[in-house]
Amino acid sequence: PGWSVLPAQVSLYPHFLIHISVNQNGEKAPENSMLYMASLQSKGGHVCGGFLISEDFVMTAAHCQVNLTRVVLGTHNIKNVDEGKIRYIEKMYKHESYQNVGTGKDIMLLKVTELNNKLQTIPLPRSEIHLGDNTKCYVAGWGFIKTGGGVVNELRVVDVSVINPRVCREMWGGVPDNVICAGGYKTKKGFCQGDSGGPLVCDGTAVGIVSFNWEKNCNYPDKPNVYTDVSKYLPWIKTILKRTKRSE
């Protein structure tokens, strides 16, 4: 299939990686909103998005495990980052069954160094969820705002609607288990290169993780954007969080 997950620095990584950039036809996020958003960075700058779920854990996509060195939190502008917004990655917990975006389980937790200041977190679903067709949600990130563009410095956000799973499977010719489809189909709204790993937020809850779109093209109205369904991995998430608490 033509799914693609390209990191922001496309030329540096294998063609099958999909680091998506939210905000095909999005707008700048309001100041002081969504401060749970994380910019996952390598020495070359922004690679993927993520989101803070506890004081020392960031959730992102498994396919974002590409030379990551640090996480920037609590800011909209990633150009001139205050040292107090930077956390370093202590350990990565990629889902043990992850192979590639096409087979699913595209989820990863990052244990990050703790800082003194408390930062905003975003809640996860409490139990397994089933979103209704056309549920309005939004996705945010620092990714490209058009095909072939570049990473943006200011966080951008776009609203997207949930797509019926059957329609999504038909349009893709099959998708992995445990995913949510929203945006990118019969609309110009959706994510693009550089947004991978960021959250799909519905009613204030992080229900999905940006996983893949169609090839390197964000200007397509015929392939739904695909997200990992966080609610299907709650037992795995709880196991990781408990394990690290015990070892401290």
Go through the PLM ranges and name each one.
Residues P1-M59, T69-T75, N80-G84, T239, ...:
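Protease-domain processing segments flanking chymotrypsin-fold serine proteases, especially trypsin-like
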Residues N25-E31, Y98-G102, I129, G148-V151, ...:
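Conserved, non-catalytic sequence blocks in retroelement Pol enzymes and Pol-derived host proteins
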Residues M37-Q41, Y138-E248:
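Extracellular trypsin-like serine protease catalytic domains
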Residues L40, V58-N100, N117, V158, ...:
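Conserved H-D interstitial segment of serine endopeptidase catalytic domains
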Residues Q41-G44, K111-N116, R126, G183-K186:
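A structural micro-motif recognizing beta-strand termini
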Residues V58-A61, T103-S127, E154-V157:
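Conserved active-site neighborhood of the chymotrypsin/trypsin-like protease fold
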Residues E96-Q99, E114-V152:
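Active-site substrate-binding loop(s) of clan PA
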